[in-house]
Structures are given as structure tokens and as C-alpha cells.
Amino acid sequence: VTLNLYNTLARAKQAFAPIDPNHVRMYVCGPTVYDLIHIGNARPIVIFDVLFRLLTHSFPKTTYVRNITDVDDKINARALETGVNIRQLTTETTERFHQDAAALGALEPDVEPRATDHIIEMIALIERLIESGNAYATDDGHVLFHVPSMPSYGRLSGRNRDELIAGARVEVASYKKDPADFVLWKPSNPELPGWESPWGPNKGRGRPGWHVECSAMSQKHLGDDFDIHGGGVDLVFPHHENEIAQSLCGNPGTHFAKYWVHNGYLMSEGEKMSKSLGNFYTVRDLLEEFPGEALRLTLLQTHYRRPLDFTKDGLRQAKATLDRFYGALRDQRGVKTTVDAHPDVLAALEDDLNTPLAVRRLHGLLDDFNDVLRRDAVNGEDGALLSAGRMLGLLQQDPEEWFRWSPTNANTLGEVEIDTMVAARRKARADRDFAEADRIRDELVDAGVILEDKPDETIWRRK
């Protein structure tokens, strides 16, 4: 296997050499569950799903861990704003996240740890950091990582300490020894989630800072050293930089993650996504208008490290593209075949997840498939197309199901009504009542249903 990945830590594309060739380990930062995910959040879900598929195909064993952050100040603020109980808010939001990820065609990770289940591990890591002199506790119950104690801090983002302070809206608090120091643990008042700890008043009742959560969860489920740490480029600083600091200083002699993989920013309709501009799309809103697979294809048509300009026009084009693929698969009436992933598509993915090239090569396989279908619809083998699609998480639906999908908010005919009208038209044609047959066809066209007359049947699909 010659897999090459761009490693943010090395600023270069590198040949992927796992620590244990028989067991690849990957950790990806998951959602903070206070709100529905938007299309920007969907990008890492889809990108790291493709990487997971590729690793699973290429290595004997892969463990993919993606966490749920269910303790955070954003969650506390949303619960206060809506009057919803915090546990109810995080449980319901997590469930919606799972539904949206499934609609995007993402496989479930092997492990999905929740931050609140790992408080003991977080406290243990913080205690080690205090013992090593890398962290300090204040009288009021704050514990902070002391950034000057780590000379190599800033290596991932490539910025020095002063630049980091200027570039991040660092909270300058009186309890900090240095403006760059960041919170590992903070005190909680009675209204907020909290756990007993060794620091501060009220039995040290407090809650973890954001960064310490991922350090503790990745170590628990993947060990001190693992292969890949992934996330959006917006997490490079401060989140991933701070994870490195905590993990290396809290576990001396270890290396933490070997390869750091980050997907690029997402624009929406040519601008930064914002509710005030009307270009803020939640995945859930988009799924009312488009099938999830069209969202997935749209996200795969730009290389993962490049900025992606997401548009509804792009989604419409992706839907039309998938209509062509599924139309060909539906026309193939022979035996379904199973073959290994196509080498051309694999080669594209092994070159730093070049999904745009992989999608182009999928189009080439479609052309080959259509050539065979024109000669012999019964023996056209769909195995190459389906196995290549599987690596990208595409083309795995039943073609009939694909064409029967309709927007949630559309005033459309139901499947039973359409089937009844198609049968009535077939009878009218058999009775040579062509005026009635045309009337039914026109009514279906007006309702967004397209008919295709085959020698022995009529099949339909929605526009």
C-alpha cells in the first residue's frame, strides 16, 4: 500500500507508515452537541469517512475513534437560552447528529466516546501535568497549562507564542501566569455541570476545559501513540496545538499523533457562512430538498485541503450526476457482480485522498459500463462501478429507491398513486386509447414524474 497523506505537522505530503502495520489507529474530533450540524461540519464527517474506508480496505485492522463533546460552555449557554435540561439537550442533539451523519452515507466509527464518561481520565492527566510543572492550580479552582513550560509549543500551527496570543482571542485573566496559558479545569457554580476534583473550594467542583477532553479520550481508546489525528483546519490552533502540549507533557517519552490531517474551510454561495447573509445551511435543512448522497458527492468534488465553495447549484448538478449513474445501474438487468475496488480509483485516493480525481475516474467507469450495456444489457457487469463507488460511499442505494426519493416539503404524488397511474396508462396503451395514455403521462410530468417505456415495462423516476 502506498498511501500518501499531507501531514500538517511536517508541512508536507508523506508516505503513510503506521506505527503497527497490522492495526491503524485514527482519532477525529467530533461534534459539540448543542445544535444541528451545518454543511461546514459535514465536510470532515464525509472526508474522514472516505479515509476510514480506504484504511479499512488497505490494512488488516483499523480503529476509528470520533468523540462527542457533551460538556462545554456553548451547551450550557444553549440550555439556559432554551430552558431545556442539559442532558436532554445533549442526548437529542447527539441523536440528530447520528441521523444526519447516516444520511451523508458515513459509516459509524468503531468507538464514539463521550467527554462526560472520561472525567476520571481527564483529572488524572491534569494531575500529571501539575506534578511535571507544566500546569498550576489557582485558589478559586482553575487549573491552567503553563505555555512557557513547553519550548516546542506552536510547532503544529507554525507560529510563535506572541503571534499565537495576538492571533487568538486569548482571555487575559488575573489568575493566569502568562497570557498564553490555557484552561484545563474550571470551577462550576451549582447551576452548571460539575464533578469533584482536587482543586479549589466546594470539594473542587468543576468541569474540564475543551482541549483536555480529546487528549484524555484519544489516550484511553488508542493509547499514548497513534497514527492519525484529524479535524477541520480551524482546529489547528488552539485546539490541536493544546492537545499536543497536554499529551506530550502529561505522558513523557511518547509522541502522541504521528500524522495530523486537516480539511480546509468551507464557503457558502461565495461568502463566509452566516445566518445574516442567508447562506447558513444546516444538513437537516438541505436534506429536505436534496438526497444525502448529493450532499456527499458535492463535498467530494473539491480536494479536502482546498477551500470549498458550497452552492445549491452545485447540489443540483450533483443530483443530476447521480441520476445518470443510478440510471445506468437500473438498466443493468443481469447478475449483480462483486469485484475488488478499482485500481484507478484506489490510486487516486492513495494520493492524499484525491477525491475529485477518484470521482472523474468513476465517470470513466460509467462510460465503460454504458458501452457494455449498449451491447448487452443482461450481462453488463456493474461490479467495477459499485466497488469503486463503495470506496467513496457512493452508488450503494437500490436504483429504484434513488429515483423514488422526493423532497420532504414538495407537494408530490405518493408512490402508490404513481404506480396506479402507470398501470392505468399501460392498460390504456394496450387498449389503444392513446389519448388517455398521453393524458396520464402529461399529468405525471406535471407532478415531476418522468416515464421511460421499456419493451416489457414502464419505469418511472422523479425529476
Residue ranges of model-derived segments:
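Short phosphate-binding/catalytic loops that engage adenosine nucleotides
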Residues: 60, 134, 449
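Short, glycine/charge-rich beta-strand/loop segments that flank catalytic centers
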Residues: 68-73, 94-97, 107-122, 140-149
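Short Gly/Ser/Thr- and Asp/Glu-enriched loop/turn motifs at secondary-structure junctions
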Residues: 21, 108, 138-140, 453-457
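Short catalytic-loop micro-motif centered on adjacent basic/acidic residues
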Residues: 64, 109-113, 229-231, 374
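N-terminal, positively charged nucleic-acid-binding surface of large information/translation enzymes
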Residues: 10-13, 19-107, 460
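Alpha-helical recognition segments enriched in aromatics with Gly/Pro capping
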Residues: 1-34, 49, 99, 120-335
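Structural preference for alpha-helix termini/caps and helix-kink/transition segments
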Residues: 272-274, 278-463
